[in-house]
Amino acid sequence: MWRQSTILAALLVALLCAGSAESKGNRPPRITKQPAPGELLFKVAQQNKESDNPFIIECEADGQPEPEYSWIKNGKKFDWQAYDNRMLRQPGRGTLVITIPKDEDRGHYQCFASNEFGTATSNSVYVRKAELNAFKDEAAKTLEAVEGEPFMLKCAAPDGFPSPTVNWMIQESIDGSIKSINNSRMTLDPEGNLWFSNVTREDASSDFYYACSATSVFRSEYKIGNKVLLDVKQMGVSASQNKHPPVRQYVSRRQSLALRGKRMELFCIYGGTPLPQTVWSKDGQRIQWSDRITQGHYGKSLVIRQTNFDDAGTYTCDVSNGVGNAQSFSIILNVNSVPYFTKEPEIATAAEDEEVVFECRAAGVPEPKISWIHNGKPIEQSTPNPRRTVTDNTIRIINLVKGDTGNYGCNATNSLGYVYKDVYLNVQAEPPTISEAPAAVSTVDGRNVTIKCRVNGSPKPLVKWLRASNWLTGGRYNVQANGDLEIQDVTFSDAGKYTCYAQNKFGEIQADGSLVVKEHTRITQEPQNYEVAAGQSATFRCNEAHDDTLEIEIDWWKDGQSIDFEAQPRFVKTNDNSLTIAKTMELDSGEYTCVARTRLDEATARANLIVQDVPNAPKLTGITCQADKAEIHWEQQGDNRSPILHYTIQFNTSFTPASWDAAYEKVPNTDSSFVVQMSPWANYTFRVIAFNKIGASPPSAHSDSCTTQPDVPFKNPDNVVGQGTEPNNLVISWTPMPEIEHNAPNFHYYVSWKRDIPAAAWENNNIFDWRQNNIVIADQPTFVKYLIKVVAINDRGESNVAAEEVVGYSGEDRPLDAPTNFTMRQITSSTSGYMAWTPVSEESVRGHFKGYKIQTWTENEGEEGLREIHVKGDTHNALVTQFKPDSKNYARILAYNGRFNGPPSAVIDFDTPEGVPSPVQGLDAYPLGSSAFMLHWKKPLYPNGKLTGYKIYYEEVKESYVGERREYDPHITDPRVTRMKMAGLKPNSKYRISITATTKMGEGSEHYIEKTTLKDAVNVAPATPSFSWEQLPSDNGLAKFRINWLPSTEGHPGTHFFTMHRIKGETQWIRENEEKNSDYQEVGGLDPETAYEFRVVSVDGHFNTESATQEIDTNTVEGPIMVANETVANAGWFIGMMLALAFIIILFIIICIIRRNRGGKYDVHDRELANGRRDYPEEGGFHEYSQPLDNKSAGRQSVSSANKPGVESDTDSMAEYGDGDTGQFTEDGSFIGQYVPGKLQPPVSPQPLNNSAAAHQAAPTAGGSGAAGSAAAAGASGGASSAGGAAASNGGAAAGAVATYV
């Protein structure tokens, strides 16, 4: 028993499963393809003239089981199989194919698709035959119109369906060719009539017809008829007098109707002369034109595309042409509509015992009526259902059962048409199933992402999403109707596991998915808009940032299309993903997009490129030739993205066929015609060139030729001049007139001249070579006045303007006299003085008296360096300002004319006082720490006296102003000093530092620089310094040294320093005071014959850094000994030099006596003549053996100067000062160079002073080797120490130098 029960239960379960399997997917039919509501046209082939044109009536549906199809025609069942083979149905579809259309196929068709669950209904379509009849066969008519008046051509168009499109055209009477009419005076109304706003003589049709055409777009055919010949009756008055006020020709109905969504055109056609202008307004407001509302027929109609209810209103056209009263006409436009859904019914799937509502709402004008269809029949005819409630807009069914499954249709109808939709109700019982489970989804932050979860079931399952035991509802989470989860504005915290949960009353199911969130891609450097001239390169840069785990690809697009870099080699994507376009052209203009793309997202940035090129060549449209002018007409052909600025009209003539000249430049860019004057007796052609900011366009094609008639010349030669080239001639010159100015054949010049004295007769000469530009008249007196004129003559006569008489002169000769009594009246400054002279007579000048030239030079410059000052000829004194200060100046004066200088006066000389110096030659400032500079400069190029020192000023430079100017103290009173430390400045501040050199006359011009101090090195100690040392003369038996601070060349140098020393072996250091104003320190009071240890310490703020220790022995001679200043008279070097000189002279005398006693002769002067004169330098050589000079006192003047230190010495200022090492303190900046960034030099070890080395080495070259050898011998025996040797050498060199000036 139990076994039988088990088997029965198993069978029941199997049957239930089978039933469920069978029901799964069953549904009523649904129409998927159907005819559009309205009409469907077909074409019937005419007898043997054309082939058949099959057409189809579509009907397709889906459903389970597959639906079966049936048709009704004109409300009755339609058996398409009864039509032989002319009709067939597509397999598996309901679509009818009519292969051979016939007239009886016309009618209303409707398709039904049925299965066991319901019947779906398609739209009803009216199938109608398209046809076009022919025009009546009539001969061409001749009609007469009056010039200037409105006129109409009426078209009797043939019948057809749909109504044919009517047009008027022009048909040539000879070959029958057809041209369309596109004319602002001719307008076609909707009824096919052609309206002339006014008739002109050109409208007369002597060799053509006006013809009316009717076109059927569906049939692709047109027909022509109503041919008209138009005769225009001329009024015999000018066009400016033939005027007519506006007159109404055709207007739309005052009450016009438009359909929503359709095109509507309102007409307002008026005639009149001149052509009337039309202004449209709506409800009193002028219409703003747009893409949807435009003007048609040159403003005579208003076109509305896709009309809507807001377009209803009163439209008014106001018409005027300046003649008579303005006219107006108003049209009231109403907008109706075929029905359209505002709420469509939707397919419903539900379970038993549930409730379903179908809702259908529609609008339209007139208001539509809604009716319901059930399984292909009006719902009133369907089986009654007490659970079903039907109203105008809804169907409600409660307590659903399986038998409620079926199709429901909503039909909204008014007098203009209908709208229909068929849906179904499917009653099922299925537990939830997941057809597409959630997957592992990746996205980037900031975007929206959707995790799919597609479920099936009946009733429709409720889908919810779960994450970490929390239901996801609201906020950024949105569960869509199909079950998918949308997360908006994803963040990194959204990454993780997500669960999709589906449930209905028959069961539940769930599935898991996951979300990975990565960093979004972004553009960090966007390309910038670029404007470039054609031919240049353009570069767009694009940088991005993206998630490191994703691969990135950079692409470039132009105008929405990817750039093919292989096909376009001018486009290059570089390694940094920039886009470079080489040799740009106008067509490269457009929008360029940088696309940074990963597999998850992309970022874009756009920039526009405008490539501007020269304009296209203008197009000449015509030329009008008149007697003496031509009017050129042209059209511009594009500005290539840079507006046209102006035009240039060029011409050439038969005289210069290979060249083009400008007839007029800068023709305004708004002009398209221009009138150009022409010369007589020439053939002209013209062309036009357009200009924009890029340049000139190619020229237009040249115009036809314009020819002008001969005439007299319109001018005489220009630039007539009479001026002699020799003292005894007169040259008359002029500018030749080009052939374009000849104006007729046999052109020549008629040259006339005469003396400008009473009763003088004109002399004449004809010049027949038009290229000749002068005539020479010989044998004339020197510099006399003439009257001259040159006349242009041709076959037609003399020029029509009188020739101007020009004054000329024969040739000039050299002035005879020099100014006398040339004196310096008063010296007013170091560079200026008043000079006076006795003038020369004008007769002695023998030419145009231009004035005087004062020539001045100095003793050092010589006459080769003279300067000239020009003075007017009507004065006899002048203030001259070009003298050299503190110098012997020379001057002379002469008169001059247009060609020659006269003889000069006697030369005078005078001494000028000292002046102020020129600026120093250079100034540099090198930072020392954060609050000091080391300044270095070079002496002025022109001291203009004896330098007395320098003054230094400084001022702080702010962003918008300069601070107070201050003099740095102490100022420098020794002219030999060319460097100084400037301390006490602010860190990281900009200063303007100025320096002036001084003489006893005051300060010279300043030289300034601007430099910034270093930033304050907070918590940074100076780098390790070093130092050098020099031994100074002892003080009361105690040793003394000078310690030179050498700051670090590698790091922070420090701002100042101090010195430390101790006796070697002791532990206590003795510290000197901090030295803040100099870079050296003198340390005295040291025990003799003692070894000391020295250090220097660099200081900056609270930080000190010590140098390495150096040992110095107070009895050493390794360091240079610096000698205090002493006078020449008691200087040891001077005494030694005098002794050495005396020894050399005695030795030389002995040698000469010995040679003479031997009979030998040593004529130095003759030997020098044989070898040629040599130019020896002033500082070397034995000039007493040279050829005697005229100025015998020159050498003696230098003897006294040898006792004074020279200002412009070859040694540097510190060496002259006597307290520095020439090896380390030269003016070329070898010491200061240590502070130049990047060019810092290592410390230089002390070297002995050797100021006489150059002179000592030069002595053999300047004089005899014997003298030099003696000097060397004296130096060698002067002492055992190197210091003594140096002194002896100094003496020898000094002796040689003195010998130069003896």
Swiss-Prot record:
What subcellular compartments does it reside in?
A: Cell membrane; Cell junction, Septate junction
Supply the alphabetized keyword list. Cell adhesion, Cell junction, Cell membrane, Developmental protein, Disulfide bond, Glycoprotein, Immunoglobulin domain, Membrane, Repeat, Signal, Transmembrane, Transmembrane helix
Q: Which GO terms describe its cellular component?
A: axon; dendrite; filopodium; lateral plasma membrane; membrane; neuron projection; neuronal cell body; plasma membrane
Query: What disulfide bonds does the UniProt entry report for this chain?
Result: C59-C111, C155-C212, C268-C317, C360-C410, C625-C706
> Per UniProt, what is the membrane topology?
Single-pass type I membrane protein
Region (Disordered) residue ranges read 1172-1223, 1236-1291
Entries under PANTHER family matching the protein: CONTACTIN, PROTEIN SIDEKICK
> How does this protein assemble?
Forms a complex with Nrx-IV/Nrx and Cont. Forms a complex composed of septate junction proteins Nrx-IV/Nrx, Tsf2/MTf, Cont and Nrg during late embryogenesis.
- Please identify the protein, giving its name as recorded: Neuroglian
